C-alpha cells in the first residue's frame, strides 16, 4: 500500500515580515500529488505572529502539512512619554531605521501667539541600517516636544519654567522655550551608554522670540543665536552638542550668570528667560537671557552596528518619530 504522503513546497520564504498597515499576499505552496488546501489568515492591522498552514492529501488518504510564519510588526513609533520595545523577527539580521528628534516648544492656548512658529527650531534626522539579531529586543525612546505654557498656567513646572521635552530636552526659563527631546534606540539595556542610534532634539528660543534655537541633529548640532538689538545686550547663547561633549551654556556678561551646559543625553536648562538646550547624544547648552537661544542636541550612530548613515540637521517639527523597515 501507498503510505508515503505528498511533498509540499512553499513558494518563497517560510518566514515573512510585513509592517502594520502594509499589504500581504500569500505566495502559496505546491504539492507533488493530491489536493492542497490552505488555512489561516493574516491581519495586517494588528501586530502579531500569524501562521498559514498548507495541507496536502493524496488519493489514498495520506496527508502532509507544513506552515509559513508571518510576522506583522509595528513599524512606526510615535511619542509615548515612556520606553517602547521592538522584538526582531526570526531570520532578520538587518533593519532600516529613520529616526527624528523633537523640535523646541511652541505656544499653547494658555498664551497663544507668544512665540510665532517661525521661531521653533527643528529636530534632527538619522537614516541608517542597523545590524540586529533575531529575537533581540530594541528599546525605543521617542523624544517629546514640550507644550509651551504661560507661567502660572497648565503644563508649567512648579518654578513656572517650561518643562523640557521628554528624553533630554532642557527646561526653558520663565517664558523661554524648552528644548526638544532626542529619539534613540538602545540595545542590551536602557541606560545612556546602551544607545546605538540617536537623533538630536532642537534648542529653545529665549522669551523675546527674536530668533529660533539651534537645530538638532548632525555630528555637531546647531548653535543658538542672539540679538544685538535687544537693549544692546550681546548675551550668551547655547552651543550645540558634539560627539564628545555637551554644548556650553551661554554666559550673561551683564548679570554674571551662566546657563546650563549640555551633557550626555541631556540639554542644559535656561536662565533669565533663556531657552533650554536640545536633548541628544550630547545635549545642547542653554541660553542665559531672553534675547538668546539654546543649542541643539547632536545625533549619533554606532560605528560598527550602523551602516549607510545619513545625518540631517533641522528636519522635524513636533515630537519625534522612529520608523523601522525590514528589507
Whereabouts are the PLM-identified features?
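Serine/threonine-rich, repeat-prone extracellular segments and beta-strand-based repeat modules
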Residues: 16, 32-72
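Short strand-edge motifs at loop-to-beta-strand transitions and within beta-strands
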Residues: 40, 84, 124-128
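Solvent-exposed, low-complexity, repeat-rich "mucin-like" stalks and linkers
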Residues: 2-31
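Short, structured beta-strand segments at or near domain termini in extracellular proteins/domains
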Residues: 183, 198, 316-327
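Glycine-rich strand-loop-strand elements at beta-sheet edges
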Residues: 101-184, 204-239, 248-250, 278, ...
Amino acid at each position: 500500500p501507498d503510505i508515503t504522503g505528498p511533498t509540499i513546497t512553499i513558494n518563497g520564504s517560510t518566514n515573512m515580515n510585513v509592517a502594520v498597515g502594509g499589504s500581504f499576499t500569500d505566495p502559496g505552496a505546491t504539492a507533488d500529488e493530491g489536493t492542497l488546501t490552505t488555512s489561516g489568515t493574516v491581519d495586517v492591522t494588528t501586530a502579531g505572529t500569524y501562521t498559514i498552514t498548507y495541507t496536502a492529501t493524496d488519493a489514498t488518504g495520506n496527508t502532509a502539512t507544513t506552515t509559513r510564519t508571518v510576522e506583522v510588526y509595528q513599524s512606526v513609533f510615535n511619542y509615548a512619554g515612556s520606553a517602547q520595545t521592538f522584538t526582531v523577527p526570526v531570520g532578520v539580521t538587518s533593519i532600516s531605521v529613520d529616526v527624528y528628534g523633537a523640535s523646541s516648544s511652541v505656544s499653547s492656548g494658555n498664551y497663544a501667539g507668544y512665540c510665532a512658529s517661525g521661531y521653533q527650531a527643528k529636530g534632527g534626522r538619522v537614516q541608517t541600517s542597523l545590524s540586529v539579531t533575531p529575537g533581540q529586543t530594541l528599546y525605543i525612546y521617542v523624544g517629546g516636544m514640550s507644550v509651551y505654557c504661560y507661567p502660572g498656567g497648565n503644563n508649567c513646572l512648579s518654578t513656572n519654567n517650561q518643562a523640557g521635552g521628554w528624553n533630554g530636552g532642557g527646561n526653558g526659563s520663565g517664558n523661554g522655550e524648552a528644548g526638544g527631546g532626542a529619539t534613540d534606540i538602545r540595545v542590551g539595556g536602557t541606560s545612556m551608554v546602551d544607545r546605538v542610534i540617536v537623533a538630536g532634539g532642537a534648542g529653545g528660543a529665549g522669551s523675546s522670540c527674536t530668533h529660533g534655537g539651534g537645530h538638532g541633529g548632525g555630528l555637531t548640532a546647531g548653535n543658538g543665536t542672539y540679538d544685538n538689538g535687544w537693549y544692546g545686550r550681546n548675551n550668551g547663547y547655547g552651543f550645540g552638542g558634539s560627539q564628545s561633549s555637551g554644548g556650553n551654556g551661554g554666559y550673561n556678561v551683564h548679570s554674571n550668570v551662566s546657563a546650563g551646559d549640555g551633557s550626555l543625553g541631556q540639554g542644559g536648562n535656561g536662565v533669565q528667560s533663556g531657552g533650554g538646550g536640545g536633548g541628544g547624544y550630547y545635549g545642547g547648552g542653554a541660553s542665559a537671557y531672553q534675547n538668546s537661544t539654546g543649542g541643539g542636541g547632536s545625533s549619533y550612530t554606532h560605528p560598527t552596528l550602523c551602516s549607510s548613515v545619513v545625518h540631517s540637521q533641522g528636519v522635524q517639527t513636533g515630537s519625534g518619530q522612529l520608523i523601522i523597515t525590514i528589507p
